[in-house]
Structure formats: C-alpha cells, structure tokens
C-alpha cells in the first residue's frame, strides 16, 4: 500500500491529496494510457471549480506507468506545476520490457548468460514487430509467420522451446490485441517529456528489475527542458516499489514487511516544500 503511505504522509504535512489509482476493471479492459491521462484532466477540471483548490499549486505523482500518465498531462496542461515520478519511465515500452527480461532472468539464476541473451534477442524480435506494425492484425500476421517458421526449424535448447511455445505465442497475442498494451508499444515518452515546462522529481530504486532507474533518470535529465528544481534520485537497495530489498525480484514484493522506505517520503516532502515555494 505505498500510495496510501504517500497520501497519508503528505496529508499530514498539509498537502491536499487526491488518489487516482485504478480504473474499474470493466473500463480498464478497453482503456489505454491516454484514457488514464484524460481521466486526470477531468479531475483537474473539477478542482478548478472549487474555490478552496482552484488557486493552489497543482502537481502529479505517478508510479511506473503512472509516470507516463503524468508526462502526457504535464506536457499538454499548463495547470501542472510539478511532477513526481517513482520508478518512472522515459524509455519506450520495448526497452523497458527487454530490461525486465534480462534483469529478472539474471536475478533468478535459472538461465545461463547465453540463454538469457537468447531470450532477450527473441523478445526484441517480437517487440519490434509489434512496435513497427500499423495495426494489431498486421502484428499478429507477422508473429504467426515467425512462429510458423520457428516450428519448422530444429529446436536445440529448452529456452528456444519456451520462447517459441504455443503458450508463449498465446501470451504475445494477448498483448497484441490488448488496447492498453498495443498503445504502449507505440507510445514515445520522449515526445511528451520534452514538452514539460514544470520541475520534476524522479525517484528510482537501485535494484529495480522492472524499470532501470539509472538509465531512465539519465533520459529524464536529457529530455526535460532545463530547470534548476529538477532532481533525480536512485535509492540504494530499493526495488520497483521502493522497498528495502535483497535482490529486487518481484517475487519479494509481497513478503517484504516494509510498505515504502521512509527516506523516499522524506525526499518527496523536502522536494515538494521547495518546489511549491518557488
């Protein structure tokens, strides 16, 4: 419950917090990241009608994909005075997923380095097909062709058999025909980040195996218009949920008692106090 911890902490410090965590399940199935951004805009519109909120500095805090939502809104809406990202994304989804494949496989120790390299290269081939296709049907056609070709070749290792199994193909097809996933494969964070005119705090975990904190913070720094209030932090021994961790593996998330590191809350508050005073 990291969002509860953040909301509670900031509320106690005098900040008005509105949590916008998830769409209802039935709506989410047909929604994309841009729909989530439109939802934020509707919330901002409702704030503008409230005399107790309309004149206050307004910002967005997004975790993981939520950072993409914050970037989209901040790029197009001048009402956004600051953005905070946790485990934030500046890379394309293809690059994020390739990092995940490599990092999680490496942490598990179940594959040899050569097998891990094969898994990454095979995944890259598939992700490139989706990202470069002009429609889900076009992507599905090319993926079917790829799997048909592979089924006619000699499979020489377990990793090849796993990557090109019918179960894996079914997973890929679910991604292709998911409006959310397909849209993410065609989303370019750089385009939106370059248009942001507000300060950003980007906080990532050193052992985040889902989003590479060092790489994405460097891209944020490169893409954002210059602002002395920008701040980029990598928290030592922290995972994607910014918990203190051992390996960073998603398997650890549910067994770590800590909800969110206290130093992350301190960084957020300290930066916010500075950002809203300017």
Regions found by a protein language model. Give the residues of each.
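Alpha/beta-hydrolase active-site loop
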Residues: 2, 30-50
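Conserved alpha/beta-hydrolase
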Residues: 7-27
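Catalytic active-site module of serine/aspartate enzymes centered on a nucleophile-bearing elbow/loop
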Residues: 238-241, 247-278
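Short beta-strand/loop motif that positions the catalytic acidic residue
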Residues: 196, 202-204
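Accessory cap/linker subdomain of secreted extracellular hydrolases
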Residues: 86-194
């Amino acid at each position: 419950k990291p969002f509860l911890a953040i909301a509670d902490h900031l509320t106690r410090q005098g900040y008005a917090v509105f949590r916008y965590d998830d769409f209802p399940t039935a709506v989410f199935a047909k929604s994309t990241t841009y729909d989530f951004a439109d939802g934020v805009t509707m919330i901002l519109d409702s704030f503008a009608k409230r005399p107790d909120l309309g004149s206050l500095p307004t910002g967005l805090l997004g975790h993981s994909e939520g950072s993409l939502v914050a970037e989209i809104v901040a790029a197009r809406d001048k009402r956004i005075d600051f953005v905070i990202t946790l485990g934030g994304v500046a890379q394309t989804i293809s690059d994020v997923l390739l990092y995940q494949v490599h990092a999680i496989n490496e942490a598990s120790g179940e594959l040899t380095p050569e097998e891990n390299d094969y898994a990454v290269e095979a995944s890259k081939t598939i992700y490139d097909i989706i990202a470069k296709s002009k429609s889900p049907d076009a992507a599905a056609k090319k993926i079917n062709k790829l799997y048909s070709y592979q089924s006619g070749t000699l499979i020489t290792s377990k990793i090849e058999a796993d990557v090109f199994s019918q179960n894996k193909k079914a997973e890929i097809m679910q991604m292709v025909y998911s409006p959310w996933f397909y849209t993410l494969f065609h989303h370019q964070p750089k385009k939106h980040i370059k248009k942001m005119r507000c300060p950003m705090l980007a906080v990532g975990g050193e052992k985040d195996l889902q989003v590479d904190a060092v790489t994405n913070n460097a891209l944020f720094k490169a893409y954002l218009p210059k602002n002395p209030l920008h701040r980029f932090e990598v928290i030592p021994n922290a995972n994607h949920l910014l918990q203190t961790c051992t390996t960073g593996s998603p398997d650890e998330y549910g067994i770590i008692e800590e909800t969110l590191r206290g130093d992350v809350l301190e960084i957020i508050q300290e930066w916010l106090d500075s950002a809203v005073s300017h």
